[in-house]
Amino acid sequence: MADPWQECMDYAVTLARQAGEVVCEAIKNEMNVMLKSSPVDLVTATDQKVEKMLISSIKEKYPSHSFIGEESVAAGEKSILTDNPTWIIDPIDGTTNFVHRFPFVAVSIGFAVNKKIEFGVVYSCVEGKMYTARKGKGAFCNGQKLQVSQQEDITKSLLVTELGSSRTPETVRMVLSNMEKLFCIPVHGIRSVGTAAVNMCLVATGGADAYYEMGIHCWDVAGAGIIVTEAGGVLMDVTGGPFDLMSRRVIAANNRILAERIAKEIQVIPLQRDDED
């Protein structure tokens, strides 16, 4: 039986590459930077241009499909995940990196049916790395199969996380406290690349052993989550329970041993869900 969603995935790869070309051209030029929820929550005309390009192209080919896009939500649309085939799009994951020309910027596309992710595409466009995964068929970077690391000892692990966009003193204290707890276990190190999607792809490659973050959105992780699991890794809620795409929090690790240890150490930061008003 033919894969009903393979054509959609092939189209997503084509669109991600086209979007990446737009991003890589724009990063060379002066930018009009705007603010969203705070002085550090940035958006550019390129974010909006790329999302509009992606959604309009997909709508033309698949008019019955649904969409959740970062900039559409910022403009007032709802993040509602239904059973309908849904494209979950982050046109530029790592906008702050993009603004500063820090070279980790990704176009991220996740595709869900019946609320389950069927495939993910993450194009780290400055690096020229195309990460892809189809449910049940493995994860790849530029055609090379990915495999998570085999590390089970957290004291020998390399973690990735982000400080996030909140500058509320209480939240910042909790973020730094969580990092301190993990750092002092001790772990080999903690890194921050500046994009959730690339952080998760680094776990999929085996370059990092685990990633955790609270404050992300569904479009940050929809594409990369399946890349982690298809590379042999796990997704988990920061409480140690099942991962929930709309919860705004995730642990992505090479195995349950590291994921559960991270969940045990960190304090949960209260957040409004993506699907709540």
Curated annotation (Swiss-Prot):
The gene is IMPA1. The keyword Zinc-finger does not apply. Pfam families: Inositol_P. Substrate binds at residues 70, 92-95, 194-196, 213, 220. Mg(2+) 1 binds at residues 70, 90, 92. It is linked to Intellectual developmental disorder, autosomal recessive 59: A disorder characterized by significantly below average general intellectual functioning associated with impairments in adaptive behavior and manifested during the developmental period. Its main location: cytoplasm. Its cofactor is Mg(2+). Optimum pH is 7.0-7.5. GO terms for molecular function: fructose-1-phosphatase activity; glucose-1-phosphatase activity; glucose-6-phosphatase activity; glycerol-2-phosphatase activity; identical protein binding; inositol monophosphate 1-phosphatase activity; inositol monophosphate 3-phosphatase activity; inositol monophosphate 4-phosphatase activity. GO terms for cellular component: cytoplasm; cytosol. Pathway: Polyol metabolism; myo-inositol biosynthesis; myo-inositol from D-glucose 6-phosphate: step 2/2. It is found in: Cytoplasm. The keyword Magnesium applies. Changing residue 36 to Q: 50-fold reduction in activity. Changing residue 165 to A/I: Reduced enzyme activity with myo-inositol 1-phosphate. It comes from Homo sapiens (Human). The modification Phosphothreonine is found at residue 168. This is Inositol monophosphatase 1. Belongs to the inositol monophosphatase superfamily. Its EC number is 3.1.3.25, 3.1.3.94.
